[in-house]
Amino acid sequence: MSFISLSVRRSILAPRLRPTATLARAYTTAKVDIKALKKLRTLNPVAMSKAKEALLSCDNDITRALAWLEEDALKAGAKKADKVKDRVASEGAVSVFVNESLTAATIVELGCETDFVARNASFVDLAAEIAQAGMGFASTSAEGAVLAGIEAHDLAAKMLDGRTVSDTITETIGRLGENIVLRRAAVVGAPSAAESIVVSGYVHGSVKGSAGGSAGKIGGLVAVTSSIKSDAHRSTLSQLTRRLAQQVVGYGPRFTTMEEYQKAGEQAEAPDAVVLEEQQFLFGGGSVKEVLAKISKEIGAPVEILSFVRYERGEGVEKADKPDFAEEVRQQLA
């Protein structure tokens, strides 16, 4: 039996090992630029490993790496969204946005699965940003300034920081791990109607997001119409609409006037329970109708409630049975 010396064996094996060694050396020579890594994570605070992967895939080009991260997050979100799409989103948040001139406003309800996510800063900011995006549906004339619903699929197609609302929701699903649904939205007022409309909103149980947005459990909008002749008039009406929005959120009326109440037919509740003008004003001074009459006399022009809307999170959604702790953990890890 013959033996092959160690040196001979090495000479035979060496050619086979060289390709692997070459590949290893090529891999290790691809290094992440530390300055680029720091800047990338400042612009997009992802995990260190994900930031490194993005830079290695993009030759340390920060602009390309940012795009890579966005695409990666969207893919991860789409995958997660497909897994959780059948879960009931009975929690969530309501957010309102009122423009600076107080002539138009929007309200949205964004649904999620748990109160924990509903209070998450990213979720709150998303709801607030979507409400702002809804301003694109505001009427361009005072004649069309009445309350109008916004179709969820139309709002989902609106752009939000370079991406559609739909894609932003999908990416957020990937990060937060819950089903997120844009349930409903509405807009009232007209940005150009500064001489005839004042709008205000209010959110109860408001939570602040990290980017300055806010959202809560119940929200409301109120728009009044009048002949506005001065800044003092507008200031008076601004305070009125703000208080009326609080009234709507707190008392939950379903009609504006007695005429609307009577047209709806027989009602189980008394008018002063469900008709906004017949309710006692939350801040005193008689009924809402009486307060409107007093302010009309004060500014020398009739003041009327144009419209109002009230959203409560999870309204009309049947809540699923809460899973036991172990099942809840499994769902979060799915």
Predicted regions and their residues:
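N-terminal chloroplast transit peptides
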Residues: 1-17
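N-terminal assembly/interaction segments in proteins that build large macromolecular machines
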Residues: 2-5, 23, 27-334
